[in-house]
Amino acid sequence: MGIWKKIKKQDLVKLERHAANHEPYCHLNVIDLWAYKITENYWFELGDTIIYKLNDYSAGHLYITLQGDKDVKPAITKLASSLTAKNTITLKCVPELAKKNIEKWQAIKSIKEDKDNHDYIFDVDKVITFSSKIQKNKSKKIRQLLNKHPNIRDEVIDLTDQKNRIKIYAIFKNWILQTGAKDWKREYNALKRAIKMPDSNLICIGFFDDKKMIGYTINRPEKNGYYQAYFGKSDRTYNSLSLYQEYVTAKFMKQTFGCKYMNLQPDSGISGLRQYKNSLGPSKKLLKYIVEIDVSKLS
């Protein structure tokens, strides 16, 4: 593989330390790097920059991305030297900082927004106080849910307990039946890999109607005031349960870990998912870019 190294468990501490120096892009978080490892993921480092070869969430093939600052150009040049018969290098999910460091480089053929992969960022205070215009209508829907189902409750559940894992998998499978989802296997396998990761710091909140588990969210607090909202499913016979889950989770993450922002991941170009995430009223998005590089103009 030349310059590339397989991402192994012992690499995750180093990769997480590097990612912590940058904005919290979900695809470069160690949970994503490990859980969505459909085949092997790869990386190499030059100076302050790491270049990755990762599995695409939806397409299933490998793509190249990076995270870095001043050493982005030499890292790309090193990447190009490892490739044969390549006139153009295409990078996906390039973070804003890296894009700014190369956008005036003569080797750049094109730069465009990677719209299917922008991260949705939410202000936690607005989520739990319903203070934005979009959020105010959500409060009414949640009240209706709780009035109709007064025995709904939530609790933090232990992901190392096999009984809890079985309940989570059952909710996911029920969601497949309710939605008719076809492309669910990658997410399901990623869910199972993430849950089994040792020392992952994942927080799972289970939602119950009396004793019956009807939903869950799986999240991870980060040191920069964010938390990553990785996985979540709900029984769709409970109208607005997913909204309630986000509200309860945001409140818990703020009270317990002091989180100020939630990263609700990209929409992967799925229209229904895009509509849902926009309906929640994101405060901003962490933008990502597709960058094409002319190898002949590298210097």
Q: What are these model-predicted stretches?
A:
Residues T88-K104, D116-D119:
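Short, glycine/charge-rich beta-strand/loop segments that flank catalytic centers
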Residues E23, H27-L97, F208-R236:
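Conserved donor-binding loop and adjoining core beta-sheet/short helix segment
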Residues I3-L33:
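Short Lys/Arg-enriched alpha/beta "domain-start" segment
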Residues T160-K212:
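Short, conserved active-site entrance elements at the starts or edges of catalytic domains
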Residues A107-A181:
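Acyltransferase donor/substrate-recognition loop-hinge adjacent to the catalytic core
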Residues N201-V295:
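Aromatic (often tryptophan-rich) hydrophobic motifs at membrane interfaces
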Residues K99-S110, Y276-K277:
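Short, aromatic/basic amphipathic alpha-helical patches
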Residues T90-K92, E155, K260-L264:
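Short catalytic-loop micro-motif centered on adjacent basic/acidic residues
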